[in-house]
Amino acid sequence: MTDRVSVGNLRIARVLYDFVNNEALPGTDIDPDSFWAGVDKVVADLTPQNQALLNARDELQAQIDKWHRRRVIEPIDMDAYRQFLTEIGYLLPEPDDFTITTSGVDAEITTTAGPQLVVPVLNARFALNAANARWGSLYDALYGTDVIPETDGAEKGPTYNKVRGDKVIAYARKFLDDSVPLSSGSFGDATGFTVQDGQLVVALPDKSTGLANPGQFAGYTGAAESPTSVLLINHGLHIEILIDPESQVGTTDRAGVKDVILESAITTIMDFEDSVAAVDAADKVLGYRNWLGLNKGDLAAAVDKDGTAFLRVLNRDRNYTAPGGGQFTLPGRSLMFVRNVGHLMTNDAIVDTDGSEVFEGIMDALFTGLIAIHGLKASDVNGPLINSRTGSIYIVKPKMHGPAEVAFTCELFSRVEDVLGLPQNTMKIGIMDEERRTTVNLKACIKAAADRVVFINTGFLDRTGDEIHTSMEAGPMVRKGTMKSQPWILAYEDHNVDAGLAAGFSGRAQVGKGMWTMTELMADMVETKIAQPRAGASTAWVPSPTAATLHALHYHQVDVAAVQQGLAGKRRATIEQLLTIPLAKELAWAPDEIREEVDNNCQSILGYVVRWVDQGVGCSKVPDIHDVALMEDRATLRISSQLLANWLRHGVITSADVRASLERMAPLVDRQNAGDVAYRPMAPNFDDSIAFLAAQELILSGAQQPNGYTEPILHRRRREFKARAAEKPAPSDRAGDDAAR
């Protein structure tokens, strides 16, 4: 039984109430009684609106399902389909042209293009790593990944391999030549660096030279005649050459260079949503407490690395000498967003007088907004660090369907600002373009938040899940691997960029693109993810600090501002392309192809769900059926479960096929997790495993889940597991894993 405190019409879990009163409110100048009265009023006023929006989702889906069932096997008449979607209010009139008016936004969002990390906030170590990933070692990122092949004697090994190190150095020198070229010669031939008359002087074997563009010299540390680092800038991103002739690497370098540091994760999303498993008050408070520590600057995590124990804390800002003299400071940490949950879920952290749980999205806005106040100014109580230098709070809002839901979020933020005594529009919104009704009405969605919006982002993983569920009754969908080449998804990516630029995002807000999920395949990422900035994205998601440093290379190669200028005024996608349903043209799959698809998806589902339900791990590096590590979260789970639910609905497979595949894949997943002491095998007692049953339920009842979301089943099953574990002691739980080291 949860211990609760009554406040007005609400009953608040004691653990949350005490955290807010004793930890979150001190330092904000907000009276506790006034705050809780405001919470009570916001919940009372906005809960009916929230529920009405969910009802509208269900009503629209029911009408779409009915339309497709009536169509039977006839080809889709696109004109009739578009007219139908317009008549039911799914497809709305496009508003007149406009420009967003959001003000008070940090430069990391408005003008600096670069990588964006997403990290589970329930794991303090990962959150700290992500916040500190503003700056990353290029040498480490190259040496430790497959970007440098382990051939010709360049294996990693347990100790430093000079052959590999030399290849790293050569790669980095080539990067410098390409990004901040010298007026003559190459960084590869440099023998020293000095600063003379405010200019960088680079010594070569036979002469001295400088930068081809002297304006790319941004500063230095140490003495001008013998600097310990040289700071350069390209496309708004900083590059720092560290010089230490006595270091292990520096002793092998003619110029004494020991590393090249790149400005990497410019922004980071601290996530309360898809990458976490927060199902009750205790889980929510863990996340809120970590968010508080990040904003106050006092979050710390004990780390044991190679037998050495230390305390990880937030990095301080970085101090430099300007080329012409005088000191300046650069941020030492990534600018933080916080991702709240969407409109669907409730949480028992607060219940009303009837015992009904309060909508979690309303709670998140109130409590993450309150906590973020500590990141707006430094003080003895708030700590020495600040997040936003312009006084803004940045909240990513996911899984919104259409402009009415965006408008509701803006109203919620406005009401929260009143409760917190903040100026209107302090709380900015990042709009995830990851639901089909938002995509086809994106211009209207942006207009609904024109004075708050700071980013739009194509979440293609969730977006694919909604694409499948929306048209569940239309027929069997193409295989998961084929989905990325479908007309709708190509149009979707272009449409997002074009809509953002048309609304004036360039120089005002981020245009973002999705995650690289193959966490170990960094060479492939370096080869292919450059397509995102080339497409006009000013940021794109990466799964780790190392990936952020490597993806930063792309923003030196691509001038995103120039790309956006070239795309301005274009409209590359049509509504017909966006509405093209990814149906299989014919059921031409051989039985072994069907079995392969089912096994691949069942293995992926089991590999993710077993850690979610049994260990509370919301974001995992899950080996696929071929043992390739993939970053999995609820978005990838949504795709896999919805595709199989669709095939089940249309007779491509049977429930017996699903069960047989799950039973085949469970032992494989058990073997892949054999090294985890907290892991509980699913085989051979499948029906005794709550995780196995959750995976099965996600598929068999996938067609009936609201918009295909996995949260209702996951939350219920995780609570079931927690209740069972409370009755019978089990191995220790964990709040995160290795998704973002």
From Swiss-Prot:
Q: Where is the active site?
A: 339, 633
Q: Where does acetyl-CoA bind?
A: 118, 125-129, 275, 305, 312, 543, 618-621, 633
Annotated Mg(2+) binding sites: 434, 462
- Which biological processes are named by the entry's GO terms? adhesion of symbiont to host; coenzyme A metabolic process; glyoxylate catabolic process; glyoxylate cycle; tricarboxylic acid cycle
Q: Which domain of life is it from?
A: Bacteria
Q: Which GO terms describe its cellular component?
A: capsule; cell surface; cytoplasm; cytosol; extracellular region; peptidoglycan-based cell wall; plasma membrane
Q: Which residues cross the membrane?
A: none
Query: Which residues are reported to carry the modification Cysteine sulfenic acid (-SOH)?
Result: 619
InterPro entries in the cross-refs: Malate_synth_C_sf, Malate_synth_sf, Malate_synthase_TIM, Malate_synthG, MS_C, MS_N, MS_N_TIM-barrel_dom, MSG_insertion
Keyword match rRNA-binding: no
* Pathway(s) the chain acts in: Carbohydrate metabolism; glyoxylate cycle; (S)-malate from isocitrate: step 2/2
Principal location class: cytoplasm
Q: Which NCBIfam families match?
A: malate_syn_G, PRK02999.1
Which family is annotated?
Belongs to the malate synthase family. GlcB subfamily.
State the name under which the record lists this protein: Malate synthase G
User: Which organism is this entry from?
Assistant: Mycobacterium tuberculosis (strain ATCC 25618 / H37Rv)
Print the organism lineage: Bacteria, Bacillati, Actinomycetota, Actinomycetes, Mycobacteriales
- Gene name on record? glcB
